[in-house]
Amino acid sequence: MAEFATIARPYAKALFGLAQEKSQIESWLGGLEKLAAVVQEGKVASLIDRPETNASEKADILIDLVGLKDKELKNFVIVLAGQKRLSILPEVYAQYQDLTLSFNHIKSAVIYSAYPLTDKQVGELAQMLNKRFDSELKISVEIEPELIGGIKVEVGDQVLDLSVQGKLSALYTTMTN
């Protein structure tokens, strides 16, 4: 959601800045990942949305569920709870993860394929894409049967569409204009 992204951005940047100061970038990434996963669970999500549960109770429950030990991360959860923003934790995690990748000079890439790819195919694609985008890429693969065949690659805001669906769409656009 674009709205959550806008709200989460300053929180992610502030937390990342603090993590840099404390040399805790990677460990806090793990804590945020756990928090984001827990917040998306049905019972926890309904608890967060319940107005009769006060903010400190919500924060304490989340901290206990995840088993947070780090003082700054606990304080972060308490601040989010106090501002009724616990539901944006998954987006904060996603943006924090992007900041971490950027800090490590790594870009995130998603390869969409109509069919499952072998490890060898993913490795070969990774080599070609690393050269093409002149950067180390963290690659994830998602299956999208509607592509019909071929692949589509997203790196940041760049899209490389080599799918049959993409070619058919381009052909349709050309024929209708």
UniProtKB/Swiss-Prot annotation:
UniProt keyword annotation of Metal-binding present: no
Cell inner membrane among keywords: yes
Localization per record: Cell inner membrane
Gene Ontology molecular functions: proton-transporting ATP synthase activity, rotational mechanism
Keyword annotations of the record: ATP synthesis, Cell inner membrane, Cell membrane, CF(1), Hydrogen ion transport, Ion transport, Membrane, Transport
Gene Ontology, cellular component aspect: plasma membrane; proton-transporting ATP synthase complex
A family per Pfam: OSCP
Bilayer topology annotation: Peripheral membrane protein
Top-level taxon in the UniProt lineage: Bacteria
Transmembrane feature ranges: none
Protein task: F(1)F(0) ATP synthase produces ATP from ADP in the presence of a proton or sodium gradient. F-type ATPases consist of two structural domains, F(1) containing the extramembraneous catalytic core and F(0) containing the membrane proton channel, linked together by a central stalk and a peripheral stalk. During catalysis, ATP synthesis in the catalytic domain of F(1) is coupled via a rotary mechanism of the central stalk subunits to proton translocation. This protein is part of the stalk that links CF(0) to CF(1). It either transmits conformational changes from CF(0) to CF(1) or is implicated in proton conduction.
PANTHER family: ATP SYNTHASE DELTA CHAIN
HAMAP family noted in UniProt: ATP_synth_delta_bact (MF_01416)
Family indicated by similarity: Belongs to the ATPase delta chain family.
Subunit structure of this chain's protein: F-type ATPases have 2 components, F(1) - the catalytic core - and F(0) - the membrane proton channel. F(1) has five subunits: alpha(3), beta(3), gamma(1), delta(1), epsilon(1). F(0) has three main subunits: a(1), b(2) and c(10-14). The alpha and beta chains form an alternating ring which encloses part of the gamma chain. F(1) is attached to F(0) by a central stalk formed by the gamma and epsilon chains, while a peripheral stalk is formed by the delta and b chains.
Protein name, entry field: ATP synthase subunit delta
Origin organism lineage: Bacteria, Pseudomonadati, Pseudomonadota, Betaproteobacteria, Neisseriales
